Amino acid sequence: MKFSSHFCEGHLPIAFVFSAPGEEEKRKGKPVAGESGANLEAALVHLHSAQPTLFSSLHRYDYRITNSFAEPIAVALGHGKSEADNREIQKPQNVQRVLSELEGCNLVILCGNKAKVLSQAIRESGKTIIEVPHIGNKGLNSKFKIPNQIRSASSFDRRQYRIKLWAEAILQAIARENAT
């Protein structure tokens, strides 16, 4: 299986597209190597439980994973930012790279605003796309509010609740796609 800080070939025809690899991904040489990856694996438990035929594995690296920008970007790496600019993402050679890396995938899940910059190009390539927030803790916290009865739960339990909501958002979007 092919790995780099921004790409995992996987063997299932579902792809997850994130923004850009960071310091952790550069160090480990695999995409979504930190908390986002742990959150993705927790979400796969929910996705597999609800749609075991579609999400047939609980392991993130069984799926295609790429990023809207290939080069690691992080403040910890000396950059003043942690994501590429939209102009960088939309450069023809970058769009072509992403489309090439998505070859063989029918369903593409765009995780976060930077991944969504590629939605038109990916949709025009004939793939089904689902758009959800980034599964990093910041993305989960900003998008999925928790009800009052869960506010006193541990931070781990609140995170698990938000991860379940993220997985449900994917399942609802798939159901809407299938209804059309």
Task: Give residue ranges: language-model regions.
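Short, solvent-exposed loop/turn segments at secondary-structure junctions
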Residues: 20-24, 70-73, 114-117, 134-138
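A structural motif corresponding to the C-terminal end of an alpha-helix
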Residues: 47-50, 58, 98-106, 173-179
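Adenosine ribonucleotide-centric catalytic and binding domains
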Residues: 2-62, 135-137
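Internal catalytic-core helix/loop-beta-alpha segment
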Residues: 55-112
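A short acidic (Asp/Glu
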Residues: 26-29, 75-77, 118-122, 142
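C-terminal capping/extension of enzyme domains
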Residues: 80-93, 120-180
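A general structural motif
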Residues: 11-12, 104-106, 126
